[in-house]
Amino acid sequence: MKLNELRDAEGATKARKRVGRGIGSGSGKTGGRGVKGQKSRSGVAIKGFEGGQMPLYRRLPKRGFTNIFGKDYNEVSLGRIQAAIDANKLDAAATIDGAALLNAGVIRRLKDGVRVLSGGEITAKVTLDVAGASKSAVEKIEKAGGSVKLPEKAA
């Protein structure tokens, strides 16, 4: 057997249906689109239209709103900060803030600030300057001998 003699097994492939190639073919003229009407024309796909049935996006209720004052924080776990320190990407002696985490590759881009969460463990004595931190994260950092600087809340 040679490469040029290779063939697909019998019944493995199915010939594609060539529509609109004469009425003798059985699928000529209208090409399986029926007769006239919007959907028989080319380029038609009415998004969200379900043939007169009430469309899904109108059957479901409106819900919620977008808070224009909402803040979107980068959430970083203590375990990821410790991993960056262990890999010598972060300096534990220096103050760790959003810019330092960005340069170390811990976060991809800085949003409205960084919020530290307590996932994982931290052993390094670090000083964090962040927009927010969970209570358990602050406890873990202070237990390791570090400190967290949070912004003052406006009264």
From Swiss-Prot:
Disulfide bonds: none
Compositionally biased intervals (Basic and acidic residues): 1-13
A GO biological process held by the record: translation
Entry GO MF terms: rRNA binding; structural constituent of ribosome
Disordered as annotated region, ranges: 1-41
Positions with biased composition (Gly residues): 21-35
Annotated signal sequence range: none
SUPFAM superfamilies in UniProt: Ribosomal proteins L15p and L18e (SSF52080)
Alphabetical keyword list: Ribonucleoprotein, Ribosomal protein, RNA-binding, rRNA-binding
Superkingdom field: Bacteria
GO cellular component: cytosolic large ribosomal subunit
InterPro entries from the UniProt entry: Ribosomal_uL15, Ribosomal_uL15/eL18, Ribosomal_uL15/eL18_sf, Ribosomal_uL15_bac-type, Ribosomal_uL15_CS
Family in the record: Belongs to the universal ribosomal protein uL15 family.
Biological role: Binds to the 23S rRNA.
Subunit annotation: Part of the 50S ribosomal subunit.
Protein name: Large ribosomal subunit protein uL15
Origin species: Chelativorans sp. (strain BNC1)
Gene name as annotated: rplO
